[in-house]
Amino acid sequence: MQRLLLIVVLAWPMLAQQSAPAIAFTSVPNYPNLPDGMNFGEVPGVAVNSQGHVFVFSRSNSATGPAFGAAAAQLFEFDQNGNYVREIGKGLYAWSEAHSVRIDKDGNIWAIDKGSNMIVKFNPQGRVIWVFGRRQEAADGAEPLEHPDPPLPAVDGLFRQPTDVAWDSQGNTYITDGYVNSRVAKIDKNGDWVKSWGTKGKEPGQFIIPHSIAIDLRDNIYVGDRSNRRIQVFDTDGNFKRMFTIDVQPDPASRAVNGVTPTGERLKSVIGQPNAMCITPGPNQVLFVGESTFPGRVFKVALDGKVLGVIGRSGRNLGQFSGAHALACPSDHEVYVAETSNWRVQKLLLH
């Protein structure tokens, strides 16, 4: 293990100041087709099923208009042409603060709610079939996100601000548990807790906000360790295999959408932060990685960590991004980007 870690550490300087070509792409205008009077809030989640239907998890609330905190989650479905189909789980008990949505190989819809600490599995018809975690009682305080200091110890079977979900070839489920517990949880195909790994920290196998997760055809598990600015790779037992970072300098003309544009050490700390990830299907898989709010780009990355290309930059306009919080990639030339700061989903066609 010491030899492996030494190799990894020595490899990191070689990744500094990476260069990568810009990838030509088109962002489909006016996507998706929203019904009259309907708007998204912040959009932290997007997923695509095998029929090409797109699922959007929005921080919004139809009952009370603009929503924050304890009532900010709606799950929408659109068809393959971007037309509105339905809202799933309207008024669901688990809804508090939307964070991620994913579709498994059987078409089941998994929604991760950061505010309620819950993960909900719907069947393709939209019926709740599994629930993981538990939210605070209705009589508890209205503020869903509490941060006791020091944090309470992690508890098997429960979550604290979970972030994302993925599956291996054997039907096991992996959940990044996330802002507080700093770990990955493994659940078997029957829904039973198997194990977890990780604690808060900077060493290999530790995390500071494991924010995204994806699994390749060989059951390698990629965890976006956001605040450590790296992607760690594990086997299905949680054994550390390797890690890599993305260090492509932004366009000097780029400006942050919200707040002051980072410079100096602050800029170094946010370049390549893996806010979002997806892996394409098929035999020649690639990884797409969405950066945090700034510099706000999307990267095409080989599974060994080599950056193959850069998509877009920070901004408000079509083809620009801010808060690329989730990605869906049904192919290596079609990518969906969910943005929190820009309150939208973009459908990208890569050339």
Locate predicted features.
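Bacterial N-terminal signal peptides
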Residues: 3-13
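Eukaryotic scaffold repeat domains enriched in small/polar residues
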Residues: 17-351
